[in-house]
From Swiss-Prot:
This protein's UniProt keywords: Glycoprotein, Membrane, Transmembrane, Transmembrane helix
GO cellular component: membrane; plasma membrane
Pfam families: Tetraspanin (PF00335)
Species, as recorded: Homo sapiens (Human)
Record protein name field: Tetraspanin-31
Protein family per UniProt: Belongs to the tetraspanin (TM4SF) family.
Glycosylation sites: 100, 109, 117, 134
Bilayer-spanning residue ranges: 13-33, 45-65, 73-93, 174-194
Listed GO biological process terms: positive regulation of cell population proliferation
Signal sequence, start to end: none
Membrane topology: Multi-pass membrane protein
Side Cytoplasmic, residues: 1-12, 66-72, 195-210
Length: 210
């Protein structure tokens, strides 16, 4: 078997979609696990992660079925959808890597003041910090109502904004890097699907069109 032939392209496309299926199931499983253990309280975050996992699973199943059956229509739509996902994911990944510390601070500030008091309290206890940044008139109010453990162990607690910035910077780099990696695997998937779709099945009727 020559690599680049019908069987090789089929096996490579099947393997790539199996990887996508495993990643999607992992996303769904991690979201359910995080909700079950109470690590993430926001139903919107859980729902978003599960939705992404289900969407990726559907794409992977369509690609796998199209590859196994050499289904022209499925492979065509698989290429189109995967190409659109690549563009979207590439832009988002580059944006994650391009966000500077000043922009992160603005986003954290804006998010903090639209949160409910319950959510703020959960974050303060989770990160063991009090208040956001000591640059606002409401910081002292946040600090007074803070219930984090650090408040009873030391005279002052670290500001949550500093911890959020540290974690957000790490998270954005990881998300951007992983997103770029998967975006290039999606381009590989589009190329494999296009190549495989235009190859003739050696087991098919020689007079049939592809």
């Amino acid at each position: 078997m020559v690599c680049g032939g019908f069987a090789c392209s089929k096996n490579a496309l099947c393997a790539l979609n199996v990887v996508y299926m495993l990643v999607s199931l992992l996303l769904i499983g991690v979201a359910a696990w995080g909700k079950g253990l109470g690590l993430v309280s926001s139903i919107h975050i859980i729902g978003g992660v599960i939705a992404v996992g289900v969407f990726l699973l559907l794409i992977a199943v369509a690609g796998l079925v199209g590859a196994v059956n050499h289904h022209q229509v499925l492979l065509f739509f698989y290429m189109i959808i995967l190409g659109l996902v690549f563009i979207f994911q590439f832009v988002i990944s580059c944006s994650c890597l391009a966000i500077n510390r000043s922009k992160q601070t603005d986003v954290i500030n804006a998010s903090w003041w639209v949160m409910s008091n319950k959510t703020r309290d959960e974050l303060e206890r989770s990160f063991d910090c009090c208040g956001l940044f000591n640059l606002t008139t409401l910081y002292q109010q946040d600090y007074d109502f803070c219930t984090a453990i650090c408040k009873s162990q030391s005279p002052t607690c670290q500001m949550c904004g500093e911890k959020f910035l540290k974690h957000s910077d790490e998270a954005l780099k990881i998300l951007g890097g992983v997103g770029l990696f998967f975006s290039f695997t999606e381009i590989l998937g589009v190329w494999l699907a296009m190549r495989f779709r235009n190859q003739k099945d050696p087991r098919a009727n020689p007079s049939a069109f592809l």
